[in-house]
Amino acid sequence: SDFLEHPDVKVIIDSIKILKKEFGDDVPIIGKTMGPWTLAYHVFGVETFLLGSVDDPNETMRSLEKLKEFTYLFGEAQVDAGADVLTVPDHATGDLVSGQYYQTFLQDIHSEMAERFTVPLILHICGRTVDRMPYIAETGMHAFHFDSKNSPQEAMDAVDNKIALVGNINNPETLYSKDTDDVKKEVFDCLNAGVQLIAPECAIPLKTKAENLVAINEGITDWLAETKS
């Protein structure tokens, strides 16, 4: 495919091969392939795409069905290169669309992805997403990576143990500008709620202090020591 030969695509595939060779025996290699809703924002423009979903929902579905093939193509190439897990960002966020929109346009597509890919999938949607978490929990995805705009406890309640949660340490305030104690407090909040995988809520600001990232792991270790004592 010409798509897979594009330099922007090849550099990711080649990077995964290098990571797999150097670190594959020690840590999971996690790839990333954008979902069709996010791709549609880039292809059509956010406003045009969202207005079109109101004016002609059938055309929107046809667009998503075509765009999802790029999600598969890129994702499968990463798996072939050595990715053990794939993150699927698909930004049907509560800031832009309703939970009902998610159910109508994306739930079935995400369920199909969970069946079609051969590795575990982590769905990511930024923003306020509690109203669509019950639908996400039914997709068969292995985990949902959620934003700090949703509290850990309400997120756990919303998914009702039907899907693992990943998150949701705040990036722009806590990790970027606060200290390690603040990071550990958020780690404790997540663990006390039952969140299974503790991680930053989204892409980490490049100037985040390394000690704040290390504090995530230290917070987990401290929590385990306290709960076992």
Where are these regions (language model features)?
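Active-site loop segments of alpha/beta catalytic cores
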Residues: L4-S229
